[in-house]
Design a protein with these regions (language model features):
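Histidine-rich, glycine-flanked metal-binding segment
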Residues: 1-3, 9-54
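C-terminal cap of metal-dependent C-N hydrolases
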Residues: 7, 24-27, 338, 348-390
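Divalent metal-coordination and catalytic microenvironments
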Residues: 7, 20, 25, 50, ...
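Metal-associated gating/positioning segment near the N- to mid-region
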Residues: 43, 48-111
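Active-site gating loops and adjacent loop-to-helix segments of metal-dependent hydrolytic enzymes
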Residues: 68, 72-74, 80-94, 144-159, ...
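Divalent metal-dependent hydrolysis catalytic cores, especially in the metallo-beta-lactamase
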Residues: 80-105, 111-133, 148-164, 183-198, ...
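Active-site core of metal-dependent hydrolases
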Residues: 179-290, 298-300
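His/Asp/Glu-enriched, well-ordered alpha-helical/loop segment
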Residues: 272-359
Length: 390
């Protein structure tokens, strides 16, 4: 068993100083004081004096098997490793495909999802890719959702020249199929929408919600934190109807000419409109960060997304923008847990919940200790558990 003592607990709501007892992968007790000497067997004590204890991050947008490829085979990014997640506080992750579903497959994504689960974190996946009809393991997106316990929904691209250029009837049909499969399998059945830069933006999603009475909460439009007032307006309209809006986290503050804004700034904009509870943060980790020439016709360089962007945006939101930590944690914990149907076991620090826990310095949001499924992954800033080939 493990006891985390003397930490200020944020569940994400502030609970004050508590001791947390962990065993069997779950939080067994949370009390003002727990004496390790009265417990049977070996008990490891983590002293969190001066630190905050929070739920582990839930990252709903990762390229487990790598991404990229738009600049030739040499620009395919490598697979993610376990420590890319654990060192950055991610204890639950959802993998998906991107542009390339030719050299990347949903079968390979499933294998990597299972590998992450075996290595110690919790991993799920979305079937499909940018394209429609959706590539699938069992022959269709709805069959994957029904029969594969690791599949929580579908990935799709809209308003992007690399996307399928589907019609509104096609989208309505996909929504109906996903909805039925979600009901049968008792899953959330979400559709994560990669939102491109074409002028239509999210118009097709709004139309299918209006014309076909599709539930707006099926949709998770992502990459919405752009300096595009019309895109933000459309996303807010969908959020008012129940959709969750995902911001892609950054690792720096963009300059004035950059078309992106920080996830923290998007969250503040939605908060002013009373829509903060509809916002999630994700990292796009493992995906490519292409650097284009001036004409946007050729890639001249490539970076790789990292999960450390989550911590950067949290620190920005709390320590520079002034939001209370209890509130700022929600897009990284409680809200994505709800989106992915995990809110009865993840996203909170509470008795019987999975022991996915972070010990952080509140002044910087630097992560000192990480527990995933009750196992210590990082202790005193040192990696304790690594992936199979790390």
């Amino acid at each position: 068993m493990i006891i985390i003592k003397h930490g200020e607990v944020f569940s994400p709501e502030a609970l004050g100083r508590k001791d947390i007892l962990v065993g069997g992968g779950r939080i067994l007790a949370m009390e003002d004081s727990i004496d390790p000497s009265v417990l049977p067997g070996k008990v490891e004590v983590i002293d969190a004096q001066g630190f905050v204890v929070t739920p582990g991050f839930i990252d709903g947008h990762q390229h487990f098997t790598g991404g990229g490829g738009e600049g030739g085979f040499q620009t395919r990014t490598p697979e993610m490793s376990l420590t890319m997640n654990t060192q950055n506080g991610v204890t639950t992750a959802v993998g998906l495909l991107g542009t390339d579903s030719l050299t990347r497959t949903v079968e390979n994504l499933y294998a990597k999802t299972q590998a992450f689960n075996a290595e110690g974190i919790t991993a799920y996946m979305l079937t499909g890719s940018y394209w429609y009809p959706s590539p699938a393991i069992c022959g269709s997106a709805e069959r994957d959702l029904t029969y594969n316990p690791r599949v929580l929904g579908v990935k799709l691209a809209l308003s992007d020249i690399r996307g399928p250029h589907m019609g509104v009837d096609d989208l309505a049909s996909l929504c109906a199929n996903v909805r039925v499969a979600a009901l049968v399998a008792d899953k959330p059945g979400i559709i994560t929408v990669h939102t491109g830069i074409l002028p239509e933006r999210l118009e097709m999603v709004a139309e299918v919600v209006k014309r076909f009475s599709v539930r707006a909460d099926m949709f998770v439009p992502t990459h919405i934190n752009r300096k595009d007032e019309e895109l933000v307006r459309q996303a807010m309209d969908l959020a008012k109807k129940g959709a969750h809006i995902d911001a892609t986290c950054m690792t720096s503050i963009p300059d004035a000419e950059d078309r992106h804004m920080n996830a923290a700034d998007m969250a503040l904009t939605f908060d002013e409109a009373g829509l903060f509870d509809q916002v999630t943060f994700s990292s796009d980790a493992g995906g490519s960060l292409p650097k284009w020439n001036e004409e946007k016709s050729r890639i001249i360089g490539m970076g790789v997304g990292q999960p450390d962007s989550l911590r950067f945006e949290l620190n920005l939101l709390v320590n520079q923008k002034g939001m209370e930590l209890s509130k700022a944690l929600c897009p990284l914990t409680m809200t994505p847990a709800k989106v992915y149907g995990l809110d009865k076991k993840k996203g909170r620090v509470a008795e019987s919940y999975h022991a996915d826990l972070l010990v952080m310095d509140p002044a910087t949001m630097e992560i000192r200790d990480v527990l995933a499924k009750g196992e210590i992954m990082v202790r005193n800033n040192q990696t304790v558990r690594r992936g199979y080939f790390e």
